[in-house]
Curated annotation (Swiss-Prot):
Alphabetical list of SMART domains matching this protein: GIYc, HhH1
Domain of life of the source: Bacteria
Main location: cytoplasm
Keywords attached to this entry: Cytoplasm, DNA damage, DNA excision, DNA repair, Excision nuclease, SOS response
Species the sequence originates in: Citrifermentans bemidjiense (strain ATCC BAA-1014 / DSM 16622 / JCM 12645 / Bem) (Geobacter bemidjiensis)
Protein name, as recorded: UvrABC system protein C
InterPro entries (UniProt xref): GIY-YIG_endonuc (IPR000305), GIY-YIG_endonuc_sf (IPR035901), GIY-YIG_UvrC_Cho (IPR047296), Hlx-hairpin-Hlx_DNA-bd_motif (IPR003583), RuvA_2-like (IPR010994), UVR_dom (IPR001943), UVR_dom_sf (IPR036876), UvrABC_protein_C (IPR050066)
Protein's gene: uvrC
Main function: The UvrABC repair system catalyzes the recognition and processing of DNA lesions. UvrC both incises the 5' and 3' sides of the lesion. The N-terminal half is responsible for the 3' incision and the C-terminal half is responsible for the 5' incision.
Residue ranges of the region described as Disordered: 603-623
Length: 623
């Protein structure tokens, strides 16, 4: 427990404190403006009845501290130590989701919109964020109906001899074939950028003036084009969810249930609600402290930082977090707790989203708990398996072999815990040996990771035997095992009838499979987990095979690494066009040097290509 004697020598300075258990494990990391005052609030003889006091008194054996010069430094150090120690009672926010943005480089000839994950400082304009690639693609799909910009890389477009199919459905203006002037295309690109920024009134004004000008100059086709654009924009704007405040903001709402906190996030960009996210984590301390810790970790995950962050409750030392976020964003960022008006309404809406997400989660957990209890009964497990892992192998006659691991928590896939393995120690086609390697690597290299309650392997008694052998050899305890054999298909050569056997579940110590009704929920869950492991393994195997087969001709060329290789394929559109390119065309590609271009030509063609003869010379040689 924490005593006054422990903190007697703590300084009244900014810093970070580390609470440790009896075995010297860090169980909580916190920051403070005044270390002595903050840690004293946790002391065991206090009359404070808050929930965090009970757990601290029971578990904390010692407290260490690190002094910093400023509160901002304490904030940064706290985040670093949380990542290093991953304390049990801190928020360990591992976000497997990546935000997506739309990119447009206005300096490019005939600018094009593309979906990207990262936002580098390259002078291009970026719009978003969007919580998923699906959301970004939907926005792009609607934009093309209003602003028919080109869809493909410039090199691909310019290589075309006729307009693409998108032009036929009026979603591309075909600049590659000269069907739109550079000035008119620039107006389209400018309008798309304004629209994505939420400046719909400016877009309408821009195109209305261009429509009127075209009509006055009797360019009736152009006038009709702008008229159609205006109509499409008006229809789309009517469908959009608009909010009363126009500042770009992230709006947070929260819902607290005992030791769990649900946070909802709404993204507002250009006055439009562009998307939202929901987060759930265990938290036994004060709500305000949990929110502050969450914000620090969330924006440390390369999440886009808007100029305004709206939160439902005050947090300690907001100025330090504002300073840190402003430094990361390269612009002033404010954190505010709205008291009235439309901003307060948005925070309330985010809170309502958090409460709804919590209610849906409870309903799912109740259903999952029933399902996992039934699964435990059917497989004779000691308790419902909260964490289930499944492994699969994919290869072609032992070549390019890979393994996969998928993880289901409370009956739902947790993709942040998925893992992929390149098989290193097995050269021949031996699925059993490959499975042994994958399982051994999982429990050797990742021994600190949470153990599963149940491991499912894709296979029957053979693969189950491998799993049991690995668990015994590595002395892994408390982990149950099961094998799920795929349905077998047998065709009678004399008839068209197909006989399918049932899915079979095997457990250690049993020679025969466990009889489960084929439509039962427990079996369907196991099949879903097995199929997900198979999908993940096959997808990875295809990626590996694709890199080996298609990337080999560009690999190993002096001066051409992964970055230049990607740039070449993007510029020319395909490996075939790279091989058809002349030395001069290769030298002119983005990021290429003359020496790298010559090395590539030698690799692709065996010797340097001769320079073309000057005009008027070499006629006799060509006869």
């Amino acid at each position: 427990m924490i005593t006054q004697a422990m903190i007697e020598n703590f300084p009244p300075s900014p810093g970070v404190y580390l609470m440790k258990s009896a075995d010297d494990t860090v169980i909580y990391v916190g920051k403070a403006r005044n270390l002595k005052k903050r840690v004293r609030s946790y002391a065991g003889d206090t009359r404070d009845s808050r929930i965090h006091i009970r757990f601290m008194v029971q578990l904390v054996h010692s407290v260490d501290y690190l002094v910093t010069d400023t509160e901002k430094e304490a904030l940064i150090l706290e985040n670093t130590l949380i990542k290093q120690h991953r304390p049990k009672y801190n928020i360990n926010l591992r976000d497997d989701k990546t935000y997506f943005s739309l990119r447009m480089d206005m300096k490019e000839q005939f600018p094009r919109l593309s979906i990207v994950r990262k936002i580098p400082s390259d002078g291009a304009r970026y719009f978003g964020p969007y919580a998923s690639a699906t959301a970004a693609k939907e926005v792009l799909k609607q934009l093309y109906k209003m602003f028919p910009l080109r869809h493909y890389p410039l090199a691909t477009c310019m290589a075309r001899k006729r307009p693409c199919l998108y032009h036929q459905i009026k979603q591309c203006s075909a600049p590659c074939c000269g069907l739109i002037s550079a000035a008119e295309y620039a107006a389209l690109a400018h309008g798309a950028a304004l629209f994505l920024e939420g400046k719909n009134t400016e877009v309408a004004r821009l195109y209305r003036s261009k429509m009127n000008l075209a009509a006055e100059q009797m360019r009736y086709e152009d006038a009709a084009r702008y008229r159609d654009l205006l109509r499409a924009i008006e229809v789309t704007v009517e469908r959009q969810k608009m909010v009363a405040q126009s500042d770009d903001s992230d709006v947070f709402g929260l819902h607290r249930e005992a030791d769990r906190m649900q946070i909802a996030l709404l993204h507002i960009r250009g006055g439009t609600l562009t998307g939202g996210r929901s987060f759930l984590f265990d938290w036994e301390l004060e709500t305000e402290e949990g929110l502050a810790s969450f914000l620090n970790e969330y924006y440390d995950l390369d999440a886009p930082i808007p100029p305004q962050v709206l939160i439902p409750v005050p947090i300690a030392e907001p100025a330090a977090l504002e300073e840190l976020l402003s430094e990361k964003a390269g612009k002033k960022v404010t954190i505010a707790v709205p008291q009235r008006g439309p901003k307060l309404e948005m925070v309330k809406l985010a809170g309502k989203n958090a409460e709804t997400a919590a209610q849906e989660r409870l309903a799912r957990e109740s259903s999952s708990a029933t399902l996992l209890t039934e699964l435990a009964e059917k497989l004779n497990l000691p308790h419902p398996p909260r964490r289930i892992e499944c492994y699969d192998i994919s290869n072609i006659q032992g070549e390019m072999a890979v393994g996969s691991r998928v993880v289901f928590i409370d009956g739902r896939a947790d993709k942040s815990l998925y893992r992929r393995y390149r098989i290193k120690g097995v050269l021949q086609s031996d699925d059993f040996a490959m499975m042994r390697e994958v399982l051994s690597r999982r429990f050797k290299a990742e021994s600190s990771e949470e153990k599963p309650d149940l491991i499912v392997v894709d296979g029957g008694l053979g693969q189950l035997g491998v799993l049991n052998a690995v668990l015994d050899e590595l002395e892994v305890t408390g982990v149950e095992a099961a094998g799920l054999a795929k349905s077998r298909v047998a065709r009678d050569m004399e008839s068209e009838e197909i006989e399918r056997s049932d899915e079979r579940v095997f457990r250690p110590g049993r020679k025969n499979a466990i009889a489960l009704r084929q439509s039962s929920a427990p079996l369907l869950l196991l099949v879903r987990i097995r199929d997900e492991a198979h999908r993940f393994a096959v997808t990875y195997h295809k990626d590996v095979r694709s890199k080996v087969l298609t990337g080999s001709e560009l690999d190993g060329v002096a001066g051409i690494g992964e970055k230049r290789k990607k740039a070449l394929l993007k510029h020319f559109g395909s490996l075939k066009r790279v091989k058809e390119a002349t030395l001069e065309e290769l030298k002119g590609a983005p990021g290429m040097t003359e020496s790298a271009a010559k090395a590539l030509v030698e690799r692709l063609h065996g010797s340097p290509l001769p320079n073309p003869p000057p005009p008027g010379e070499g006629a006799m040689d060509r006869k």
